């Protein structure tokens, strides 16, 4: 007898609604609960609107039903496991495309920004002027450098330093600031002038003695160019040996050399 009474009381407690005693909301929420083995034919049944209650669209009914706004934070929406919203579309394809694009951009950036050689090649002596006094030879030479930029970005030549050596003695020096721009994959020729003063007695005789037919002397030109690219400075050394006629002025114009392949 007591057992039957206990079961009856338990059944009454289960049938008791957990919602507030509002007739409009109770009738509204009744459509979203099932007891025992009862199975609704639809995931959400359209509900009748009450005049004094505001409603929000049921998230699982695809817009076909409504729930009381007061119960929006109390009711739980159930969606099938096979619902398309639980299966992100083309996730693998999107990730693959994103990774591929990032790798492609990274590879292209490395390819175009990777520093390549900047070649400085002395073309030779372009012209020279000679002057004498009683003890020394004043020799002014104009030389030409060919600069080749193998990078995919421009470079700027900012400084030139050079010195002239004759018989291991420094006879002339020059330092000058420049602003020579060289485009990507381009070559330019740059002339520069060095004034030299030779005090060697034997050299003076070679240059001034009229009985000597050949008045050439050998000078060694050493120098360096300072280039800047992508805010990075770089020094490029060069060296050349030139035979100079120290008896009279001469001019040997050099045409621009083609860029080496």
UniProtKB/Swiss-Prot annotation:
UniProt-annotated stretches for the region Disordered: 1-22
Cellular component aspect of the GO annotation: plasma membrane
Transcription regulation is among the record's keywords: no
UniProt keyword Transmembrane present: yes
Short name of one Pfam family: TMEM106
Origin: domain of life: Eukaryota
Biased composition annotated in UniProt, kind: Polar residues: 1-10
Single biological process term from Gene Ontology: positive regulation of interleukin-6 production
Membrane topology: Single-pass membrane protein
PANTHER family xrefs: TRANSMEMBRANE PROTEIN 106A, TRANSMEMBRANE PROTEIN 106B
Function of the protein: Activates macrophages and polarizes them into M1-like macrophages through the activation of the MAPK and NF-kappaB signaling pathway. Upon activation, up-regulates the expression of CD80, CD86, CD69 and MHC II on macrophages, and induces the release of pro-inflammatory cytokines such as TNF, IL1B, IL6, CCL2 and nitric oxide. May play a role in inhibition of proliferation and migration.
Family: Belongs to the TMEM106 family.
Name by which UniProt lists this protein: Transmembrane protein 106A
Organism annotation: Rattus norvegicus
